């Protein structure tokens, strides 16, 4: 054996809440970013999602995600809406599923002009990490840097709480990835090396993932509760 490589979907995989100012714009960009990193997106919060502030706060508390991706606003644009979203997260004071004594990882990938205010709101209550804006201008997404941060925090905050993780790390020759993220990388590698468009399906125990690479653009979507173990009844329904 030349190398041992491991992926993980333990504990239901990487579960995230994402947020954006406009649901159909930065909200969808944040969702694509998290999905492409191998996460299950539990909810998309947005300033215009029709929910009242207390409903958004209660929803964050209820879900207890592994981490939150906070996005919104183009660079140089208004800061008030994304800071408002940060305040909802701070008011919820959410605790991660694993490691109750740890702070919840929050990734900020929104308007760079709002960074100082987001730090003021979330810096003490969460394990806040800042990265490049996932949508710096309306016409362009920039998902790569935030996806890499998600991978890093998955190892540092989520997998580190899993029983046996340290022992498993001694065996592996590469960092442990979320299983959907690893499958996505396989699809992108095939598309790049063969110079073709690729569509792939990964049928798991609880969810089914669809991957595509068209014109070098990668996308992943998740059909929740469609799988081959305890959600098999939904497939057959």
For the regions a protein language model found, what residue spans apply to each?
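Nucleotide/phosphate-binding catalytic cleft detector across ATP-hydrolyzing
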Residues: 1-197
């Amino acid at each position: 054996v030349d190398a041992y490589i491991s992926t993980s979907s333990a504990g239901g995989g990487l579960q995230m809440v994402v947020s954006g100012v406009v649901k159909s714009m930065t909200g969808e960009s944040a969702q694509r970013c998290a999905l492409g990193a191998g996460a299950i997106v539990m909810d998309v919060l947005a300033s215009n999602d029709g929910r009242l502030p207390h409903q958004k706060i209660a929803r964050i508390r209820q879900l207890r995600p592994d981490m939150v991706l906070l996005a919104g606003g183009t660079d140089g644009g208004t800061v008030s809406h994304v800071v408002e979203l940060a305040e909802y997260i701070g008011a919820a004071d959410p605790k991660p599923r694993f490691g109750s004594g740890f702070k919840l990882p929050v990734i900020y990938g929104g308007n760079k002009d709002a960074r100082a205010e987001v730090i003021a709101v979330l810096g003490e209550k969460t394990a806040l990490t800042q990265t490049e804006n996932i949508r710096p201008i309306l016409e362009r997404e920039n998902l790569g840097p935030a996806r890499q941060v998600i991978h890093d925090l998955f190892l540092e905050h989520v997998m580190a709480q899993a029983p046996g993780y340290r022992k498993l790390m001694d065996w592996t020759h590469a960092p442990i990835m979320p299983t959907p993220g690893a499958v996505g990388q396989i699809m992108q590698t095939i598309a790049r090396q063969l110079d073709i468009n690729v569509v792939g399906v990964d049928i798991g125990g609880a969810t089914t993932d669809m991957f595509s690479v068209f014109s070098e653009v990668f996308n992943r979507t998740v059909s929740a509760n469609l799988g081959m173990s305890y959600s098999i009844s939904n497939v057959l329904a």
